[in-house]
Amino acid sequence: MLSSTFVRSKAGLVPVILAALILAACTGDAPQTPPPVNIQDEASANSDYYLQQLQQSSDDNKADWQLLAIRALLREAKVPQAAEQLSTLPANLSDTQRQEQQLLAAELLIAQKNTPAAADILAKLEATQLSANQKVRYYQAQIAANQDKATLPLIRAFIAQEPLLTDKAHQDNIDGTWQSLSQLTPQELNTMVINADENVLQGWLDLLRVYQDNKQDPELLKAGIKDWQTRYPQNPAAKNLPTALTQISNFSQASTAKIALLLPLSGPAQVFADAIQQGFTAAQNGSAVTASVPVTPNVTESSPTDTAAVVSDDTPATLPAPVTPPVVTNAQVKIYDTNTQPLAALLAQAQQDGATLVVGPLLKPEVEQLSATPSTLNILALNQPEASNNSPNICYFALSPEDEARDAAHHLWEQQKRMPLLLVPRGALGERIAKAFADEWQKQGGQTVLQQNFGSTTELKQSINSGAGIRLTGTPVSVSNVAAAPASVTIAGLTIPAPPIDAPVVSTSSSGNIDAVYIIATPSELTLIKPMIDMATSSRSKPALFASSRSYQAGAGPDYRLEMEGIQFSDIPLMAGSNPALLQQASAKYANDYSLVRLYAMGIDAWALANHFSEMRQIPGFQVKGVTGDLTASSDCVITRKLPWLQYRQGMVVPLA
């Protein structure tokens, strides 16, 4: 039997338990308290979650949830929805909310490709008032808004975000800083003004100067970088060099003791191969060196009417002589005819013969085979495949009209032209040239390029006799998706896909916005094309005219030069007057056939590139000043040529400053 004390105690507990149960039930029926909101922190949930919280929250928290939803929508590439939410934010925001709103507005504008407006907003934000997470987004927005051109704000943004990054992002940031610095021109670097307390930036600028002063000598560059690391031990790049400079630490000079020269010494291409071989041999023996005596120029390029600066087509304007001297060595060269055996067999034979470097092949079908032909030999191909592969032992050196068109795209862009029309011959050659130009044009930020084809000289004569001019119209050049598509934007580690490309708008009027015409024509064709353009345009709307070296041949007298008044054209430095003695020697050898003279020059530069193969392959920015152009290598070792440009003025040919 239970004691009366126990019964009373148990009975006393009943009301307490009942009250607790009732309280628990009431608590369960009450609405849940929403989680705390911190708009300055990470926003890792999806937009649906934040939008749901926005609907369920009280008025005090609605703006916070809406700001988080906008961030999530941008992360999910739902740009229109993000813009709609941003436009409906309440006007009475707190200072913290206002900062987040401005940061989101800048990120939205970047996603919409309106980087100038984004940069204006970012310039008004005070970074010191932002949280660590917001600072990362702020600096990455600064980088995205200034990515079109290397500027001081862009470089400062890279430097400022470095302490906020972790793991692999550190190296990516260092590489991005270096890439931006490398795009600065010498003039921009020399005129740059920085604050006295910007020690990290000063270190970066000194590293750039070390690189620019010594990049032509790998050993000096190695020593310079090591000294820089000692002087700037706290700089992020002192601990982790940019990837491009890390390669220099591992630089090794490849042997050129035995060179295999692969050319089509028989068949239809023999005449071209012979010219290249003779140039290669002349450079090897030093005969091209004796002809390379610098001639002191007596021109004043800034004066368009200075007759001391002008010469006829037979005596091109004197330009500075190449600063990269041809290499004279005791290398052995053995020549192989690519028309006698398959390419794979020739490469195997060359390796068996002890070759350490291959120069060639020349013809594009054989160059296309290189990537599928296993060989450990270093190879300097004398042409370029349609799609180059980044093979660590192959470089590509082409003297092609496509290569010249790519240089023309840069020249027209530097001349502030933005609406070019290409006049190219009908057929495969014209299509290749147009595509090469348009690809390079769009890489620089240019828009649609228009193309117009022309037929034979007979057709042109018929048109001009009928009084028909050439109207400034054309069809859009079809370019590769990689070149044509705008890049996506990454902000705070979030990649926003590029917007769809609108269909190009084609000018249909001769009084449209075309401001430049690039013409690929022979002298006889250009003689007809230029007056036909003049017939169809007024003097006020006349575009600038540019031509390729195809229009510059021997035998063009003063009448032709007068007719070509104002046209700018490009050619290799040898033809532009960099070395008159060598030009005279080569012209005599080939009876003034300028096409063969250019191939002879290609052979000279092929020798120079062969002897600097390791530098071109391993040192970014290494340059050979050759007789076919200023030669540099892309990341996949495609040799690019920067050409001199000349202009017809008052019956003379003058170099452009």
Swiss-Prot record:
Q: State the GO CC annotations.
A: periplasmic side of cell outer membrane
Supply the alphabetized keyword list: Cell outer membrane, Cell shape, Lipoprotein, Membrane, Palmitate, Peptidoglycan synthesis, Signal
Q: How does the annotation summarize its subunit structure? A: Interacts with PBP1a.
Gene3D superfamilies on file:
1.25.40.650, 3.40.50.2300, Tetratricopeptide repeat domain (1.25.40.10)
What the protein does? Regulator of peptidoglycan synthesis that is essential for the function of penicillin-binding protein 1A (PBP1a).
What topology in the membrane does the UniProt record assign? Lipid-anchor
| A GO molecular-function annotation | enzyme regulator activity
Q: What is this protein called?
A: Penicillin-binding protein activator LpoA
PANTHER family given for it?
PENICILLIN-BINDING PROTEIN ACTIVATOR LPOA
- Quote the residue positions with lipidation, kind S-diacylglycerol cysteine: 26
Indicate the principal place this protein occupies in or around the cell: membrane
InterPro entries according to UniProt? LpoA, Peripla_BP_I, TPR-like_helical_dom_sf
Question: One of this protein's GO BP terms?
Answer: peptidoglycan biosynthetic process
Q: SUPFAM superfamilies from the entry?
A: Periplasmic binding protein-like I
Q: Which family does it belong to?
A: Belongs to the LpoA family.
What organism does the record attribute this protein to? Yersinia pseudotuberculosis serotype O:1b (strain IP 31758)
- The lipid modification N-palmitoyl cysteine is placed on 26
List the HAMAP family hit by this protein, alphabetically: LpoA
- From the UniProt annotation, give the residues forming the signal peptide: 1-25
Q: Where in the cell is it found?
A: Cell outer membrane
